[in-house]
Structure formats: C-alpha cells, structure tokens
C-alpha cells in the first residue's frame, strides 16, 4: 500500500474555475491510483501467502479487490449526488463535522503509519535487520562490510537528512503522474525479476511445493490467527482517500471509476504474482518483509546482481512515494489544527513547525519498530479497514442524498459486517498473542 494523496481532505474552498482548463489525463489517473495502491503492502503479501496458503490468499485478494472497487464507487456516487469534492466533505454531509474530523484523523494515522513502514523497509534494504536470531545484511554491509556508519541508525539518519528533508521541504505537489509512473514501473520491475527468479528456481528443482491451504495444528489460536493476515491485504488495497483528488482533476469525474477498476485489476494481478512467486521462491523462510529474503547469497554473480537490483529498485520506489505521503499528512494536520489560518505555503513558521516534528517522529518510529508485520496488522485491522470499507458502507446506509439503491444497501451491509467482524477478531487475536508471548 502507497497512499499518495495530492490534496488536503478538508479544503478551505472549492477548486477555482480557472483550473478547469487543465484537466488530468486518464492514463495519469490510472498511474496515480495504481501508485496509491502499490506501496509497501506488496512487501508483506508473500508472508500472508505463507500464513494463509495459496488458494485462500488468492481468494482474499480477489474479494478485497472487488470490495475496494465497489466502495470507491460508493464514495464517488455519494459525492456527485451532493456538493462535496472530497472524502471528508462526503463524510461531513452524512455525519456532520465529527464525520469529517474522523476520516481526516484516520487518514493521518494511515499516512503516518505508511511513512514508518516505508522507512523500516528502506532501513532493511540499506542496513539489514535481525529476525529470529538470523542476521540479514543490507546492501551497504554487502558492498563495504560492517561499519558504524552503515548501521541501521546512521543509514536511516543519512537518508532522512540528505534525501527526505530536502524533498519534504517542497511546498507544492503538482503533476504527480510522471513520478507516479516511475514509482509504479520500479515496483513492476521488482515483480518481474522476482517472478523470473522463482521460475528459474522451479525449473532447476530448487523449490518446494507451496502450501495450498493453511496448516491448523495448534487448535483454535491458529485458526483465529489466520484473521491477522487478512488486514495485511486490506492495507495493500487502501487508496480511497486519493479517489476524489484524482477524479476532480479529470474532465469527467466519473471517468475515475474506470481508472479505479483498471488500477485495482492491475494491482490485484501484481499482488497475486508477487505473493505466489516469492512464496514459491522462499517457502517457509519467507520474511514479513520479503526484501530481506533477497540478501541471501547465490551461486552466480548474475543472481547476486538481480537480488541487489530487486532491493534497490523497490527502495527507490518507496523513497519517491515517501514525500507525497508527508505532504498529505502535513496538509491534513494543518487543516485539523489551524482550519482558519492562511495557506500553509504562505506561513513559514507554521510550515517548519509541522514539517520537522513529523519527520523526526517518523525517523524515531522506524528505529523503534523492527518489523513491518506489526504495523500492517494494526493499520489493516483499524484505520485502513475504516477508510476502505466501514466509512463508505456507512455513507451508503445513511443515504443522506437519497442515492442508494436496495442492492447497494445490501452490499454495504455485508461489507460493514465483514469489516467490523474481521477487525474485532484480528485485534483480539493480536492482543491475545502479544499477551501470551509476554508471559512466556
């Protein structure tokens, strides 16, 4: 999941008519939405395959992809039936100011959490990590050996100071289609190379048959633990806060529905291929951040080069998306704290007062949290499921503008029940597992 938001969710004014002459392209809309979907979530998909098995994982990807497309349609239909051009505006029409604040806060949690996840993965790539007593070397250790300056702390510090800081100091984010295209193509490069490596390993007989279904050997806890993998896939399909900014840059906002459908199908295919081939390639040794698996040595220099390209290309992809998330987070936080102030671009003091604490907090979070799986479980079972399913379903059932059909209300009811039930089970299981681990 890379949720690149291009505009504050609570704008102070409607888009000016002068901007109507410069409409966004359909291809740009597809790239922007696809980049919003394919973020760090793809890194945890193979681990979900390991937990759930191949067939349940593929089934859940298809179901969540379909539900995500449907819920995005709910949002646009509600928006066009009313007068709102933002997600928060639609929530405000349905549930008042509290609804707008709720979706803004949840979006901030998702974007900040995603920034931490991105930073953790980048740290894994450049400086390595230790998992279950096994040390996974980063690119810097492989190239230059282990030194104090390429440890995780100093590696991330260098990235934050000399790369992220200059980028997040940019005050305007415009015309994201080109950067989104580059980011998406880098993600696609990762999928292609990992698929080729898996096929080569399969031909050479170096792979084991993947589990088609989960193994339930530990009783009820293992069964309920399956629900902790589903939120990871939900997080990977959360893009709904970017639908409105993309839609209202198009000549016809309804075209975003076709762009969304294409993006969801494309990303579901990419997720399925990534999960299947990476799980086939690494089997039960698949890590929660699959990039860490690509640090293993190979018998050829070509294999080692491909491993490095896989990790480096995706790390660069995340680096390109990171400033977009920061821009959205900062804009929404400013709108929440200072709704009556002048534009953030025109207020240096407020701009720096928000930028530096957010960046420092993200850096500290990436150092303190060693594993992206915990963050994916938390975000997927709380914030992202609210943005992707609970809020859109509630808008349809509320039906303030009278646009909902009986069929849509039935689908929304099922969506709401599934989302809430899965979240409760996932949260309860995570708490139980964490408590049991602490006791042992």
UniProtKB/Swiss-Prot annotation:
GO biological process: amino acid transport
Keywords attached to this entry: Amino-acid transport, Membrane, Transmembrane, Transmembrane helix, Transport
Principal cellular location given in the protein's record: membrane
Record localization: Membrane
Entry's family note: Belongs to the amino acid/polyamine transporter 2 family. Amino acid/auxin permease (AAAP) (TC 2.A.18.6) subfamily.
PANTHER family: AMINO ACID TRANSPORTER, AMINO ACID TRANSPORTER AVT6D
Protein name: Amino acid transporter AVT6D
Taxonomic source organism: Arabidopsis thaliana (Mouse-ear cress)
């Amino acid at each position: 999941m890379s949720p690149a938001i291009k505009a504050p969710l609570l704008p102070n004014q409607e888009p000016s008519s002068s901007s109507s002459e410069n409409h966004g392209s359909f291809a740009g809309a597809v790239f922007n939405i696809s980049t919003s979907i394919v973020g760090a979530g793809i890194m945890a998909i193979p681990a979900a395959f390991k937990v759930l098995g191949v067939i349940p994982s593929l089934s859940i990807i298809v179901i969540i992809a379909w539900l995500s497309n449907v819920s995005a349609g709910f949002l646009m239909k509600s928006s066009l039936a009313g007068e709102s051009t933002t997600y928060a505006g639609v929530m405000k029409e349905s549930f008042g100011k509290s609804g707008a604040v709720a979706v803004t806060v949840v979006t901030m949690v998702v974007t900040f959490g995603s920034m931490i996840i991105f930073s953790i993965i980048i740290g894994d790539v450049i400086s390595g990590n230790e998992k279950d007593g096994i040390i996974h070397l980063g690119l810097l250790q492989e190239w230059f050996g282990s030194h104090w300056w390429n440890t995780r702390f100093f590696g991330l510090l260098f990235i934050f100071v000399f790369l992220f800081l200059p980028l997040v100091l940019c005050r305007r984010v415009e015309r994201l289609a080109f950067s989104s295209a580059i980011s998406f193509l880098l993600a696609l490069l990762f999928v292609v190379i990992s698929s080729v490596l898996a096929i080569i390993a399969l031909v050479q007989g170096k792979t084991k048959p993947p589990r088609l279904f989960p193994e339930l050997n530990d009783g009820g806890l293992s069964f309920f633990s399956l629900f902790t993998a589903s939120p990871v896939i939900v997080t990977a399909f959360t893009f709904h806060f970017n639908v409105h900014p993309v839609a209202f840059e198009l000549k016809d906002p309804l075209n975003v529905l076709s762009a969304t459908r294409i993006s969801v199908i494309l990303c579901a295919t990419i997720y399925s291929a990534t999960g299947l081939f990476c799980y086939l390639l690494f089997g039960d040794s698949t890590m929660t951040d699959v990039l860490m698996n690509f640090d293993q040595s190979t018998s050829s220099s070509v294999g080692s080069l491909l491993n490095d390209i896989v990790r480096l290309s995706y790390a660069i992809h995340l680096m390109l998306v990171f400033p977009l998330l920061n821009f959205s987070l900062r804009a929404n936080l400013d709108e929440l704290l200072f709704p009556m102030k002048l534009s953030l671009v025109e207020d240096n003091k407020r701009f720096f007062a928000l930028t530096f604490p957010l960046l420092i907090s993200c850096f500290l979070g990436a150092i303190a949290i060693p594993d992206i799986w915990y963050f994916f479980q938390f975000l997927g079972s709380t914030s992202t499921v609210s943005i992707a399913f609970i809020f859109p379903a509630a808008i349809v059932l509320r039906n303030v503008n009278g646009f909902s059909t009986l069929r849509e209300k039935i689908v929304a009811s099922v969506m709401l029940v599934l989302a809430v039930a899965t979240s409760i089970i996932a949260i309860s299981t995570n708490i139980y597992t964490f408590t049991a681990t602490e006791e042992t």
